[in-house]
């Protein structure tokens, strides 16, 4: 019985591995090495029985096999230079906020499902991707830049109104979570003689919080860290102005990836706002799915899709 299950796992691996190894514009590995069921069992036997499971414990053995298979697939995906970059950004989130919607569908629409899974693997038919296996022009259909997915979701000038709406949705969610203090949104600090407009300023007594939201593309975890650092550097002058007035001032970059990655240092903002543990859990998930919804809208509008359209593969 166990051998038959292992054979099925090996078959599943053979079927799924080409999808994981496939780079857009390339081809799967010409040869796939599969391990016989007996070799898999021998490799897992020590792990399984070392954990205290008894011989003949089918449920325990299957659990170990499933975990081993999942880890192998995940390692293969994360090792891919292009299709694994979003996955590497998602792994920094210990709460898995960017993926829990797959189980409960929280704040996710039907149209978001086909978009987000292909977007995270860079399999959407934007011109730069299509040009890898065809003679199509890689240029953006609305400007002269290469039409990559990061360009569509974060940089194309034609999409800026939709990009701003995605940004403002997250700003509004943070504002609604503020429990006390005077809130200022998108306003210059005139006394500081600065033209900068922080997304959110919360003042309470002699304490000032400056929160600025951004949604960079999930190009590895470093992209999220760099985006946060740019926010800290940008508002350092405004921070020093409030410090000079004898106030305690903190600057926070609130970073949500365009494809739903949660930056770990966002936890500092949640603590400063005094959120309960239960609401924090919900808030994280809502912010990630807000970003996914906004990116879906941006992509569909970029391709000129109407409300009745279901799939983007046939859009030009």
Model regions: which residues?
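Metal-dependent nuclease catalytic cores in nucleic-acid-processing enzymes
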Residues: 231-246
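Domain-level recognition of nuclease-like catalytic cores that cleave nucleotide substrates
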Residues: 249-316
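Active-site metal-binding core of divalent-cation-utilizing nuclease and nuclease-like domains
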Residues: 129-134, 173-214, 234
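Conserved, non-catalytic sequence blocks in retroelement Pol enzymes and Pol-derived host proteins
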Residues: 106-107, 129-133, 159-166, 220-227
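Short beta-strand-loop-alpha-helix junction that forms the active-site gateway
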Residues: 205-230, 256-258
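Short Cys/His-based metal-binding microdomains
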Residues: 1, 132-173
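Extended C-terminal regions of large enzymes
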Residues: 1-128, 135, 291
């Amino acid at each position: 019985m166990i051998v038959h299950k292992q054979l099925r796992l090996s078959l599943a691996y053979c079927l799924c591995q080409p999808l994981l190894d496939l780079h857009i514009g390339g081809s799967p590995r010409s040869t796939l090495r599969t391990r016989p069921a007996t070799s898999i069992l021998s490799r897992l036997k020590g792990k399984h029985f070392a954990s205290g499971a008894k011989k003949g414990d089918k449920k325990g053995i299957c659990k170990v096999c499933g975990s081993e298979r999942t880890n192998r697939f995940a390692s293969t995906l994360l090792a891919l230079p292009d299709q694994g970059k979003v996955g590497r950004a998602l792994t920094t989130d210990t709460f898995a906020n960017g993926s829990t919607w797959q189980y409960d569908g929280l704040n996710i629409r039907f149209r978001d499902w086909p978009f987000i899974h292909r977007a995270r693997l860079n399999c959407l038919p934007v011109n730069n991707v299509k040009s890898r296996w065809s003679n199509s022009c890689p240029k953006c259909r609305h400007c002269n830049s290469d039409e990559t997915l990061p360009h569509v979701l974060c940089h194309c000038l034609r999409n800026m109104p939709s990009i701003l709406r995605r940004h403002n949705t997250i700003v509004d969610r943070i504002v609604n979570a503020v429990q006390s203090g005077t809130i200022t949104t998108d306003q210059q600090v005139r006394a500081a003689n600065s033209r900068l407009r922080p997304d959110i300023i919360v003042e309470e007594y002699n304490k000032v919080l400056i929160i600025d939201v951004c949604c960079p593309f999930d190009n590895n975890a470093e992209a999220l860290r760099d985006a946060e650092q740019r926010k800290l550097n940008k508002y350092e002058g405004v921070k020093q102005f409030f410090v000079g007035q004898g106030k305690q001032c903190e600057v926070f970059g609130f970073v949500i990836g365009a494809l739903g990655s949660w930056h770990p240092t966002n936890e500092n903002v949640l603590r400063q706002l005094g959120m309960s543990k239960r609401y924090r859990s919900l808030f994280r998930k809502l912010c990630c799915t807000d970003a996914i919804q906004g990116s879906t809208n941006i992509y569909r509008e970029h391709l000129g899709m109407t409300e009745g359209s279901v799939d983007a593969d046939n859009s030009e």
